[in-house]
């Protein structure tokens, strides 16, 4: 990890602006453990690039849109550890990233010049929502964040070769856990339940994610 460049959030934003201005399409993957600040960083990047270069230039496409539905997780017996690597449609996510990068350098999306529609995740109902995010042909920066973008198992391991760059969010564990407890409480858990989920379920996922962060292009201190 010591050989990787470590950026501040401001430096990461500047790097994203440079990618957006470089011509063609760049797709940046942001990895990190639960609560590391991936979505916050992705939103900041997209907001600042949009402010500088115009609407539609940058779009955020979260990996969380590929969560399996709760009914599917119930059927598989995995609902009690939602967020683990086998609770996502991994092949579906990789296929979407391929579509987003297929016409790299042309400003197209999947080679057809048409808009690509991506799913989002609605935390209010704790479910993925299909066809929520438009990525039009003129988009030159796609930012996609998720836990497992650097995982070494199939099909996840294909992703680093598809992204223009991969960024890994790094943060102190105590800060990360506090963020998770707050998030889980906002979505209905009591403090004890929120902390248990953050330490046990999210914690197990964090161990897996952290082991692969050395594969990122750069680290971002979040």
Question: Residue locations for each model-derived region?
Answer:
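Extreme N-terminal, non-catalytic leader segments
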Residues: 1-27, 33
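Residue-level preference for the first positions of well-ordered beta-strands
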Residues: 25-29, 57, 141-143
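Conserved lysine of the Walker
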Residues: 38
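Hydrophobic positions on the alpha1 helix immediately C-terminal to the Walker A/P-loop
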Residues: 41
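Post-Walker A helix-loop "phosphate-sensing" segment adjacent to the P-loop in P-loop NTPases
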Residues: 47-59
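Conserved nucleotide-sensing/catalytic segment adjacent to the nucleotide-binding pocket
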Residues: 62, 68-125
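ATP-dependent NMP and nucleoside kinases share a basic, alpha-helical "lid"
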Residues: 125-183
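Small-molecule kinase domains that catalyze NTP-dependent phosphoryl transfer to phosphate-bearing small molecules
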Residues: 130-131, 154-157, 185-222
């Amino acid at each position: 990890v010591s050989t990787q460049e470590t950026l501040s959030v401001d430096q990461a934003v500047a790097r994203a602006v440079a990618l957006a201005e470089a011509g063609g399409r760049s797709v940046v993957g942001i990895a990190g453990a639960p609560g590391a600040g991936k979505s916050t960083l992705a939103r900041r990047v997209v907001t600042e690039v949009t402010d500088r270069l115009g609407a539609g230039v940058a779009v955020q496409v979260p990996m969380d849109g590929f969560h399996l539905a709760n009914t599917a997780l119930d059927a598989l017996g995995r609902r009690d550890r939602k967020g683990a690597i086998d609770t996502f449609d991994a092949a579906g996510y990789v296929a979407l990233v391929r579509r987003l990068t297929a016409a790299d350098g042309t400003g197209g999306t999947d080679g057809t010049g048409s808009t690509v529609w991506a799913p989002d995740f609605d935390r209010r109902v704790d479910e993925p929502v299909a066809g929520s995010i438009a990525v039009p042909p003129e988009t030159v920066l796609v930012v996609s964040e998720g836990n497992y973008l650097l995982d070494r198992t199939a099909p996840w391991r294909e992703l680093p070769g598809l992204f223009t760059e991969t960024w890994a969010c790094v943060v102190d564990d105590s800060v990360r856990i506090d963020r998770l407890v707050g998030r889980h409480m906002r979505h209905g858990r009591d403090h004890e339940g929120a902390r248990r989920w953050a330490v046990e379920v999210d914690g197990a996922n964090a161990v897996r994610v952290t082991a692969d962060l050395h594969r990122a292009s750069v680290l971002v201190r979040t």
